[in-house]
Amino acid sequence: MDQDFDLDEGAGQFNLKTTLMMFTSNDSQNDDGIWSPGSPYQALEDPSFLDKHFVSDPDRYTADELYSALEKMDGKSDLIGMDDMDNDNCYSLSPPDSGSLPISPASTSPSSYHSSGGEDLMDCYPSIDILQQASEELLYSKDDDYEICSSGPLLAYTNANSVATSAVHQNQQQQQRRLNQAGFPHQNSNGLVRFKSSQPRVLNPASISLNAPSSSFNPQSTSSTPATSSSSSSSTNGGFVKSSTGERRKYPPLRLDEEEIKLCKKEGICLPDFFPLTKAEERDLKRIRRKIRNKRSAQTSRKRKQDYIEQLEDRVSESTKENQALKQQIERLSSENQSVISQLKKLQAQLGQNAKRTTQAGRCLAVFMLSACLLVSPQLSPLGNQDNQKVLECIEEACQPSATSMNSANSAQRAIAGVTAPSVVIPSGGPVMVSTNANRQMNRNAVLNHHNNSKYPASGNQNHHPIALEDLNHPPPTLQPKQSYQQQHQPSMYRRSDETIAMAMAKIGARKGSSTSSSSASSVASSTSTSSATSPIYRTSRTLGAFEDQCDASSDDSNCANMPSLVPMKMSAQPPKRKIVTMNGQPRVTYRAVPASSVNVEQAQYYKVPQQKVQYVTMDRPIKYEVLQLNDYIKMEEESTIRLPNSWSTAGPRLHPQVNASSRTVRPLTVATPVHYNGPSAKKIKTQMF
């Protein structure tokens, strides 16, 4: 009911009939057939109605009295037959909006709900749960009882917009008809909630505003009425809600614990006892519960830390006690260790004194026994005194220098006999002059020789041909054994000491004639001969003393009687020039020695070897030549005589043993006749500096 009414008490007088007609006209807007024939409102037109129910004097009626009279009439159903007709009262839940349709049949607001026409009155209407209202409308039944609609106060006058308001209601009814024709279920008009009164309508006189302005509308009083009706329609005991359709719906209760209730009171948050909750209430409830969870988590964390600290304290106390016990044990062990060390030192001192005494006695005994052994050992030697004396004399003779003497008469025989041995010694100074004692053989060889043989007389005496160290004439050819080319050892200027001792021992053994000495001497001689066969042994002498090894090795001293004495070597101040025979020169005659066992007297055998061309070489130092020949013997000649340095003069000691020529006998020597040999032989010469 959007019409505004007001009871105007102008000077305490008003027209009773006119006022009643105004009340009835307000209801006539909702029902077009209220003034139709047979309607109860037609009784107002009867003049006896006022006389019957109201006093004709209008002064005695005030607004309150008139209202109470109308209530009595309403209770008696005299004015309107409540038992015979349905009185439907409605009020709008939304501002009126012409020409709008609801969004859906369950909607309670038009599509243009937020249009410009209704935004000014939004605060005048309460917020209603749309889902709840839709469920109530869907479950709507005409036969159900309706609750009393506590509408706003009825105003006693109609404002200037009453005509426009009736037009709005007509439009709403037309919209409802169109919805019904479109197939939507039966619903109330948009924005309207219908209530059917099950009890007589009771109006509170205090709610009627008599001093309200005639042209004003109070939205606050209007908005409070729907809120009250909404709360009364939805709040019941036990969380049950009875809707307008009479359906009882139960919502779960909101259960809060003591901490949540306490925190809500502390923060001033009021929450309902049952669901549903608004978004703000849900937000507050979540915040409260989050605070409670954080509080409990913090308490748990603090408790865990406290437990950990207590455990650490217990461990510290236990460790402290254990440390104290270990300290006491260490002190006790250190004292025991000191006592044990002192005892050990005393024991070591006592043992050291005893050990020194025993070692001194042992050392003295060992020295005494060693000295006794040294004194007794010479007497136990297997060698006799004479043998030792002979060895010493032989060594002394080997160290004495030999006097310069001419060659003996039998030196040539020893030289020729020595050629048969496999070892040949080549002097370092010049060629060895060889002479034969066979006069006939020498004369025959001299006739066949193409060279100048006047130098070689028929006499076999070696004294006719003394060795001239500075003679520049060509000496007779040197007989050298045929050797194969192989690696040679370094030549030595002097005889080695071990060879000298071996010779002396061999000599001593030969003189004694013992089998042991003879075997040792022969073994030494054989080893010397074998070694000399592989490599020539160089001596410092220019004479035939090179063959003394064979003489010394023999068991008979008579064969060594004609051994010539050793001749010292001399060197000139000028550098020597040596002649090396090559194959490019004219052939010359050389001789080859043949062993006596293979000599046939009837058929003379000797070989003629072509000589080589002489090549002059100037050297600054003495040179030793090592001659290697594969097939035959060669001859080496000297341009000038080599002189040794002053340190090598005759005054210096000689390592060769002194040979007694008188004790030597002539050795038999057989020399074959020379035979012409025309085949060239391959020769190799190796020069070595020293």
Swiss-Prot record:
Give the span(s) annotated as Leucine-zipper. 326-333
- Which SUPFAM superfamilies did the record assign? Leucine zipper domain
Q: Which GO terms describe its cellular component?
A: chromatin; nucleus
The consequence of inactivating this gene is: RNAi-mediated knockdown targeted to the gonadal distal tip cells (DTC) causes DTC migration defects. Significant reduction in expression of src-1 and tln-1 in DTCs. Causes slow growth after hatching.
One record GO biological process: regulation of multicellular organism growth
List, as start-end ranges, the regions of compositional bias called Low complexity.
100-116, 170-181, 213-236, 480-492, 514-535
Polar residues: which segments have biased composition? 451-464
Q: Where in the cell is it found?
A: Nucleus
Region Basic motif: start and end of each range? 286-321
User: What InterPro entries does its record include?
Assistant: bZIP (IPR004827), bZIP_sf (IPR046347), CREB_ATF_subfamily (IPR051381)
Q: Which segments does the entry list as coiled coil?
A: 295-350
PANTHER family recorded: AGAP001464-PB, CREB-H TRANSCRIPTION FACTOR HOMOLOG LET-607
Similarity comment text for this entry: Belongs to the bZIP family.
The protein's name: CREB-H transcription factor homolog let-607
This chain's source organism reads: Caenorhabditis elegans
The gene that this protein is the product of is: let-607
